[in-house]
């Protein structure tokens, strides 16, 4: 069953993981299409999943129910390393649903700088009772690569009611979080030394809930020295987490 999902899986990939195919645990049948025409790419999956209705009590409203799933992804390459795209998914089970819509962009600004942006909205009706809820997630990152300076900064904010039944959201993308993580590495190449190069770096993370209460913080400086056949490095990490 897994090869059905694995082929051309990158068609459906976005920075926020909105399709984690192991969420579709017991598919009964489905149709999948991916294709490209020039700068355009398109992918779709129509499938159902028997898992939600299995091994339930006969009085359970979801007994025997199947989740019906539709996924659509489209993108356009606008240069060698730039792309804009969209992602849509709908998972329906019983009287409920989880719908996700996203737009994303990867833009190469010049030879050194690239930015990624994504905005995601979700609309959820619980499968059994409860109130409908909507949520959103936004994230933007900027990256610099070069011989002397490498830099990464990534901001992510996710509201409390954000829900992706088909996705997988790690610590930094989870609902009710707002945070930023940064890394900076400076490379030096001495011309009159036995040292080929040395690198000094710093990594830091701030993660709060949407009310501003600190959840996690990490700070980590590092230093590495490179000789012709040997490297030496030292790192230090200080972190605090509220469970």
Predicted regions: what they are:
Residues 69-125, 190, 198-201:
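Surface-exposed extracellular loop regions of Gram-negative outer-membrane beta-barrel proteins
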Residues 118-243:
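Exposed, low-structure sequence patches enriched in small/polar residues
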């Amino acid at each position: 069953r897994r090869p059905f999902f694995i082929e051309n899986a990158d068609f459906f990939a976005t920075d926020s993981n909105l399709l984690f195919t192991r969420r579709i645990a017991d598919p009964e049948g489905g149709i999948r299409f991916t294709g490209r025409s020039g700068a355009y790419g398109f992918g779709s999956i129509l499938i159902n999943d028997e898992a939600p209705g299995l091994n339930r009590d006969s009085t359970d409203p979801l007994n025997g129910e199947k989740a019906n799933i539709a996924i659509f992804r489209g993108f356009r390459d606008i240069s060698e390393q730039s792309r804009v795209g969209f992602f849509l998914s709908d998972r329906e089970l019983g009287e409920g649903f989880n719908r996700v819509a996203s737009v994303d962009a990867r833009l190469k600004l010049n030879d050194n700088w690239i930015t990624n942006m994504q905005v995601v909205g979700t609309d959820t009706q619980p499968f059994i009772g409860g109130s409908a809820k909507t949520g959103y997630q936004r994230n933007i990152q900027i990256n610099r690569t070069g011989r002397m300076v490498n830099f990464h900064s990534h901001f992510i904010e996710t509201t409390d009611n954000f829900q992706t039944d088909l996705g997988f959201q790690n610590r930094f993308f989870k609902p009710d979080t707002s945070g930023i993580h940064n890394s900076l590495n400076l490379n030096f190449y001495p011309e009159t030394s036995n040292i080929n190069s040395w690198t000094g770096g710093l990594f830091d993370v701030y993660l709060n809930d949407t009310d501003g209460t600190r959840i996690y913080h990490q700070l980590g400086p590092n230093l590495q020295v490179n000789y012709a056949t040997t490297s030496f490095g030292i790192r230090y990490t200080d972190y605090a987490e509220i469970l």
